[in-house]
């Protein structure tokens, strides 16, 4: 709802983690009390999206990793928990899976 990042998920996750643009503005971030943890940001881009799309209650739900769920996911080169927020957008996608099949 505001122009702080592109539509790329990793860009949005970085903003959620820092409340700053990719240039580090503003210092301290917008509303720093709204900074999300990595787990909260990943949930916002996965399980929360599925819930908004009413796909979390289907016979084969998506948006989370659990038995019976649709395996749509990306495998990143590094764990987002292990990098600084400003490094998240540069994480390379090692593989993409749709319905459990590698598609890259």
Where are these regions (language model features)?
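P-loop/Walker A phosphate-binding loop and immediately adjacent motor/lid segment at beta-alpha junctions
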Residues: 85-104
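His/Asp/Glu-enriched, well-ordered alpha-helical/loop segment
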Residues: 1-81, 96-99
